[in-house]
From Swiss-Prot:
<dbReference type="InterPro" id="IPR008867">
    <property type="entry name" value="ThiG"/>
</dbReference>
<dbReference type="GO" id="GO:0009229">
    <property type="term" value="P:thiamine diphosphate biosynthetic process"/>
</dbReference>
<dbReference type="Pfam" id="PF05690">
    <property type="entry name" value="ThiG"/>
</dbReference>
<feature type="binding site">
    <location>
        <begin position="184"/>
        <end position="185"/>
    </location>
    <ligand>
        <name>1-deoxy-D-xylulose 5-phosphate</name>
    </ligand>
</feature>
<comment type="function">
    <text>Catalyzes the rearrangement of 1-deoxy-D-xylulose 5-phosphate (DXP) to produce the thiazole phosphate moiety of thiamine. Sulfur is provided by the thiocarboxylate moiety of the carrier protein ThiS. In vitro, sulfur can be provided by H(2)S.</text>
</comment>
<keyword id="KW-0963">Cytoplasm</keyword>
<feature type="active site" description="Schiff-base intermediate with DXP">
    <location>
        <position position="96"/>
    </location>
</feature>
<dbReference type="GO" id="GO:1990107">
    <property type="term" value="F:thiazole synthase activity"/>
</dbReference>
<feature type="binding site">
    <location>
        <position position="157"/>
    </location>
    <ligand>
        <name>1-deoxy-D-xylulose 5-phosphate</name>
    </ligand>
</feature>
<keyword id="KW-0704">Schiff base</keyword>
<comment type="similarity">
    <text>Belongs to the ThiG family.</text>
</comment>
<comment type="subunit">
    <text>Homotetramer. Forms heterodimers with either ThiH or ThiS.</text>
</comment>
<feature type="binding site">
    <location>
        <begin position="206"/>
        <end position="207"/>
    </location>
    <ligand>
        <name>1-deoxy-D-xylulose 5-phosphate</name>
    </ligand>
</feature>
<protein>
    <recommendedName>
        <fullName>Thiazole synthase</fullName>
        <ecNumber>2.8.1.10</ecNumber>
    </recommendedName>
</protein>
<dbReference type="InterPro" id="IPR013785">
    <property type="entry name" value="Aldolase_TIM"/>
</dbReference>
<comment type="pathway">
    <text>Cofactor biosynthesis; thiamine diphosphate biosynthesis.</text>
</comment>
<dbReference type="GO" id="GO:0005737">
    <property type="term" value="C:cytoplasm"/>
</dbReference>
Length: 257
């Protein structure tokens, strides 16, 4: 179980709902992953018309919590407007805030992100900010009212996995009591297990599952990897050593002369 902003969640895996081959495969992947939170783009809902209505009905039928996002927004005004519309459409104050600064890398505009987070937090939103692994930016987001942070481990959709382990370790150590959810850049179940072993509270991913040859199987694999990584962290991992350490005791050995 995972306590997140006063809500008990059975799974530490959050799953995106875009790019799946079909609605049926999306539904099966969500079920196979064990997730209890899915992200949904308001832009998709508004642009989809009748298809968007069917998609929304499908998501509701899965019985999972909705985390709307402001994907595709490149300005504070656009992101704030989208967030407010999402609250009306989906009936939740949770919002994954994205303010994109670069078309090429999809790197967040951290200045706009902090400004947008402050506006939305003051308006009663629970903001999940998609951010970098920069500690100063993280501090500013917390000062703005955020109670959870969502640092990337690599650019969105890159599947590179954690490219800066030192930064991720520093973030976990610097914010021991803040829920930290790794968002973006995970490509393999082993990547998810790795960041969970660092002590991160959860992961959010989309492309690695949606564009896999078998999305349902990959969703199941990620669910198991997240659980394994968390259990490993909770059980106490051994620190790496530069020298060999015998696993067999040397006491009581026979001595031949």
């Amino acid at each position: 179980m995972f306590e997140l902003l006063g809500t008990t969640l059975p799974s530490r895996l959050l799953l995106g709902t875009a790019q799946y081959p079909s609605p049926a495969i999306l539904a099966d992947a969500v079920k196979a992953s064990g997730t209890s939170v899915v992200t949904v783009s308001l832009r998709r809902e508004m642009a989809g018309g009748r298809a968007g209505e069917k998609f929304w009905s499908l998501i509701r039928s899965l019985g999972v919590r909705i985390l709307p996002n402001t994907a595709g927004c490149h300005s504070v005004k656009e992101a704030v407007t989208t967030a407010k519309m999402a609250r009306d459409v989906f009936g939740t104050s949770w919002i994954k805030l994205e303010v994109i600064g670069s078309h090429d890398t999809l790197q967040p505009d951290v200045f706009g992100l902090v400004e947008g987070a402050r506006i939305l937090c003051e308006d009663g939103f629970s903001v999940f900010p998609y951010t970098t692994d920069d500690l100063v930016v993280a501090e500013r987001l917390l000062e703005a009212g955020c109670r959870v942070l969502m640092p990337w481990c690599a650019p969105i959709g890159s599947a590179l996995g954690p490219v800066n382990m030192t930064a991720l370790r520093s973030m976990r150590g610097h914010f021991p009591d803040v829920p930290l959810i790794v968002d973006a850049g995970l490509g393999r179940p082993s990547h998810a297990a790795t960041v969970m072993e660092l002590g991160f509270d959860a992961v959010l991913l989309n492309t690695a599952v949606a564009r896999a040859a078998d999305p349902v199987g990959m969703a199941r694999a990620f669910g198991k990897a997240v659980d394994a990584g968390r259990e490993a962290f909770s059980s106490g991992l051994l620190e790496p050593r530069e020298v060999a350490v015998p696993s067999t005791p040397i006491f009581g050995r026979a001595v031949f002369s």
